[in-house]
Regions:
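Non-catalytic, polymerase-adjacent accessory regions of viral genome-replication enzymes
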Residues: 1-44, 48
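Glycine-/proline-rich flexible loop or hinge segments
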Residues: 24-37, 70-79, 106-108
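Short, Φ-rich (hydrophobic/aromatic) sequence segments
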Residues: 46-51, 89-93, 97, 170
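Conserved polymerase palm-domain catalytic core
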Residues: 53-54, 60-67, 72, 107-108, ...
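Amphipathic alpha-helical interaction elements
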Residues: 7, 24, 28, 98, ...
Length: 201
């Protein structure tokens, strides 16, 4: 795949793969109530317009729909549901930039990474225990994603992503806001947890 990073993101091949992934994952509709089943028709009618808006940096992501899901024992977990269009764009971004960041991650980082799994994390832990290490640190990252500093995150992103248009698009997703019980809330920090892999893992 040649061209700029943005060209790669908006290539027909990349967008088609992104569409297939979003369609397979399905999931709930976002704030606009568009299902993934309606996405194909929407893209047939508006695909070129969508690409042009992104190229001209005029595309505006919709707020993420926040819903509560029971974790059992009275605990609830807040989930973020982007619109089908935003899931498509996020997936298209992810497919292109993920390999750029993948080589920077620690080999024993297993969350949301290609060719990594929970089972591999357990096996590595057992190997470490068998090597004689006996201390285990259990860290709960429950609120981590809600507290991420946008400027620091974008500083890290910009070390690898040099194109202003792509960095700006990612930043727009960070500040697109959330809708909770019909009310819009600005997002000045944090990253909404989405049902697809996060753009920056």
């Amino acid at each position: 795949m040649k061209g700029t990073v943005l060209d790669q993101i908006l290539s027909d091949k990349n967008l088609n793969v992104a569409y297939q992934r979003v369609y397979q994952n399905q999931g709930m509709p976002g704030v606009d109530k568009m299902t993934v089943f309606a996405l194909k028709g929407y893209l047939q009618r508006n695909g070129e317009k969508l690409k042009n808006l992104i190229r001209q940096q005029q595309f505006k992501p919709q707020p993420v729909l926040r819903i509560e899901r029971s974790k059992g024992k009275g605990d609830v977990r807040l989930l973020g549901i982007p619109t089908a269009v935003d899931r498509l764009v996020q997936q298209a971004i992810y497919q292109v930039i993920s390999p750029m960041f993948e080589k920077q991650f620690h080999d024993h980082s297993y969350g949301y990474r290609p060719n990594k799994s929970c089972e591999m994390a357990v096996m590595t832990s057992l190997e470490i225990l068998n090597d004689g290490y006996v201390w285990v640190v259990d860290i709960d990252l429950e609120t981590f994603f809600d507290l991420i500093n946008h400027d620091k995150l974008m500083g890290i992103v910009s070390r690898t992503i040099k194109e202003t248009a792509v960095a700006t698009l990612i930043k727009k997703y960070l500040v697109s806001g959330v809708t909770i019980k019909g009310r819009f809330h600005q997002t000045t920090r944090g990253v909404a947890q989405v049902p697809i892999k996060s753009v920056i893992k």
